[in-house]
């Protein structure tokens, strides 16, 4: 059959046995990829520093998804939080990877079996003997089973009734761990950042799915609806399935990019909006202010800021800073973070505290401008020194570090002050190792950015696929010129309009 590449799937259009076979093979490929990718990531993952070199800095993609569902231990003897363990149990990272690979192999064998034994009795209509599927009944079965799985996940896995729970953290991504979650049945369950909504929504959606599945198993669709929506056509199934997938892809692209309880920043990295809004900076200043109110010194107050919190407040961890087509992990970009140098506080010769204006997300370069507490520009690094009025040299700017590795160190020479002012544009200042991975200094995106871009792109493609296949199945008679409900035997070429004896073709 000389089919073009874009029409090869027509070979399984009227062959339910082999249609099932190719779908099982597809599942084998998906599960095989997931298991293999997990093993690859585990081979290259360095768990030694969960604070400054977490999974998202290393470009891990499947490890965060396993972790958010409750997997934290490795057969290598390490724990995702940085500790060591002696008894990881079967459901470690490697155990999950192995389960996917074994499942993939079983699906591979099942696909071959169904390809060879395609002509099963279950696929044929007992009245006509032709291949036929009761699609509304199959829909009911699948909806019931999906509802059961959804309910079970929410009621048992997430709640810890029979399972580990899910990854839960505080709003600043500091205390994350796997723990059971109680369902949130009030209005708070609709807050995308409340983990309890994950449990309650799965329980509610699962219950609805079970009831809807039973409904579709026990009630047949009306004839007019069945014919109007072409429920007997397998391409209707394809169209509606694509709709479900693209809708889900758009939703998860949103929850990933804007953040939610299901995409913790400890596993996927911070969102760009946390940089844009100064989210971590405000919390750091709040903590320092609270420390100063308790009569702590600047040095003491800044030394109590967790390194993890300071690291989030660095533009290199903003997923929108990496170009879409810059391959590699964040560590391959600006390097592996080694330590926090501390918070620089700039002052002019009159003793005013100055603040460096931070670089907005979508700038590659940005002028170095220092403002006072009222937002008045007091110093800058000028483009043309001949016309400068606020240069570091003229204003006499000095810098002193509080907290971190340079705690208590101050600099007054203009070259060093300007160096740290430039670095302060990018948030908190960190020492970065660019030698180990030969990092090129160009920012990369985090798995949060890749996931969003991939799912938004495929959702758009699948949206068009839904329109395409939906219109094909709804207007099949128009496209083919054949009434799908035509029962009488017709002779091709005998009539101007197929099957219409009033327009018999004129013999020339």
Curated annotation (Swiss-Prot):
<keyword id="KW-1133">Transmembrane helix</keyword>
<dbReference type="InterPro" id="IPR017486">
    <property type="entry name" value="PSII_PsbB"/>
</dbReference>
<protein>
    <recommendedName>
        <fullName>Photosystem II CP47 reaction center protein</fullName>
    </recommendedName>
</protein>
<dbReference type="GO" id="GO:0009523">
    <property type="term" value="C:photosystem II"/>
</dbReference>
<keyword id="KW-0934">Plastid</keyword>
<keyword id="KW-0604">Photosystem II</keyword>
<keyword id="KW-0602">Photosynthesis</keyword>
<keyword id="KW-0157">Chromophore</keyword>
<dbReference type="GO" id="GO:0009772">
    <property type="term" value="P:photosynthetic electron transport in photosystem II"/>
</dbReference>
<dbReference type="GO" id="GO:0045156">
    <property type="term" value="F:electron transporter, transferring electrons within the cyclic electron transport pathway of photosynthesis activity"/>
</dbReference>
<feature type="transmembrane region" description="Helical">
    <location>
        <begin position="101"/>
        <end position="115"/>
    </location>
</feature>
<feature type="transmembrane region" description="Helical">
    <location>
        <begin position="140"/>
        <end position="156"/>
    </location>
</feature>
<comment type="function">
    <text>One of the components of the core complex of photosystem II (PSII). It binds chlorophyll and helps catalyze the primary light-induced photochemical processes of PSII. PSII is a light-driven water:plastoquinone oxidoreductase, using light energy to abstract electrons from H(2)O, generating O(2) and a proton gradient subsequently used for ATP formation.</text>
</comment>
<keyword id="KW-0812">Transmembrane</keyword>
<dbReference type="InterPro" id="IPR036001">
    <property type="entry name" value="PS_II_antenna-like_sf"/>
</dbReference>
<dbReference type="GO" id="GO:0009535">
    <property type="term" value="C:chloroplast thylakoid membrane"/>
</dbReference>
<comment type="subunit">
    <text>PSII is composed of 1 copy each of membrane proteins PsbA, PsbB, PsbC, PsbD, PsbE, PsbF, PsbH, PsbI, PsbJ, PsbK, PsbL, PsbM, PsbT, PsbX, PsbY, PsbZ, Psb30/Ycf12, at least 3 peripheral proteins of the oxygen-evolving complex and a large number of cofactors. It forms dimeric complexes.</text>
</comment>
<dbReference type="Pfam" id="PF00421">
    <property type="entry name" value="PSII"/>
</dbReference>
<comment type="similarity">
    <text>Belongs to the PsbB/PsbC family. PsbB subfamily.</text>
</comment>
<keyword id="KW-0148">Chlorophyll</keyword>
<feature type="transmembrane region" description="Helical">
    <location>
        <begin position="203"/>
        <end position="218"/>
    </location>
</feature>
<keyword id="KW-0472">Membrane</keyword>
<keyword id="KW-0793">Thylakoid</keyword>
<feature type="transmembrane region" description="Helical">
    <location>
        <begin position="21"/>
        <end position="36"/>
    </location>
</feature>
<keyword id="KW-0150">Chloroplast</keyword>
<feature type="transmembrane region" description="Helical">
    <location>
        <begin position="237"/>
        <end position="252"/>
    </location>
</feature>
<feature type="transmembrane region" description="Helical">
    <location>
        <begin position="457"/>
        <end position="472"/>
    </location>
</feature>
<dbReference type="InterPro" id="IPR000932">
    <property type="entry name" value="PS_antenna-like"/>
</dbReference>
<dbReference type="GO" id="GO:0016168">
    <property type="term" value="F:chlorophyll binding"/>
</dbReference>
């Amino acid at each position: 059959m000389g089919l073009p590449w874009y029409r090869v799937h027509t070979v399984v259009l009227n062959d339910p046995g082999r249609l099932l076979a190719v779908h099982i093979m597809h599942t084998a490929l998906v599960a095989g990829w997931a298991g293999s990718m997990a093993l690859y990531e585990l081979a290259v993952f360095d768990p030694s520093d969960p604070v400054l070199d977490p999974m998202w800095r290393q470009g891990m993609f499947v490890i965060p998804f396993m972790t958010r569902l409750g997997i934290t231990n490795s057969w290598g003897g390490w724990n995702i939080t940085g500790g060591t363990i002696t008894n990881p149990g079967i459901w470690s990272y490697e155990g999950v990877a192995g389960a996917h690979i074994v499942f993939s192999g079983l699906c591979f064998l099942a696909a071959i079996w169904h390809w060879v034994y395609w002509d099963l009795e279950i696929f044929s209509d007992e009245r006509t003997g032709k291949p036929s599927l009761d699609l509304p009944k199959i829909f009911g079965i699948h909806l019931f089973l999906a509802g059961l799985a959804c309910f079970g996940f929410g009621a048992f896995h997430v709640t810890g009734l029979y399972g580990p729970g899910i990854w839960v953290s505080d709003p600043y991504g500091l205390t994350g761990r796997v723990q059971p979650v109680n369902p949130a049945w009030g209005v708070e369950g609709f807050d995308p950042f409340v983990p309890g909504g994950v449990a309650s929504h799965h329980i509610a959606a699962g219950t609805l799915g079970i009831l809807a599945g039973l409904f579709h198993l026990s009630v047949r669709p009306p004839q007019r609806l069945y014919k109007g929506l072409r429920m007997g056509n397998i391409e209707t199934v394809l169209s509606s399935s694509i709709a479900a997938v693209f809708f889900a892809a758009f939703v998860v692209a949103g929850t990933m990019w804007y953040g939610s309880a299901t995409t913790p920043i400890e596993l996927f990295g911070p969102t760009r909006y946390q940089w844009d809004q100064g989210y971590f900076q405000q919390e750091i200043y709040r903590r320092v202010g609270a420390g100063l109110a308790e009569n702590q010194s600047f040095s003491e107050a800044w030394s109590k800021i967790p390194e993890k919190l300071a690291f989030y407040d660095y533009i290199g961890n903003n997923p929108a800073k990496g170009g879409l087509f810059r391959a590699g992990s964040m560590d391959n970009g600006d390097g592996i973070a080694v330590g926090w140098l501390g918070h620089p506080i700039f002052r002019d010769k009159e003793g005013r505290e100055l603040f460096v204006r931070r670089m907005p997300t979508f700038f590659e370069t940005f002028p170095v401008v220092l403002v006072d507490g009222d937002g008045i520009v007091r110093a800058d690094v000028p483009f043309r020194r001949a016309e400068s009025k606020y240069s570091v040299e003229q204003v006499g700017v000095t810098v002193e570090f509080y907290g971190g590795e340079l705690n208590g160190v101050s600099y007054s020479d203009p070259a060093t002050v300007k160096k740290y002012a430039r670095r302060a544009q990018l948030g908190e200042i960190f020492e970065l190792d660019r030698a180990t991975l030969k990092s090129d200094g160009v920012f990369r995106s985090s798995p949060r950015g890749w996931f969003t871009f991939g799912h938004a792109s495929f959702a758009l493609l699948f949206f068009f696929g839904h329109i395409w296949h939906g219109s094909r199945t709804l207007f099949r008679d128009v496209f083919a010129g054949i009434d799908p409900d035509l029962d009488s035997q017709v002779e091709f070429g005998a009539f101007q309009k197929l099957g219409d004896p009033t327009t018999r073709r004129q013999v020339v």
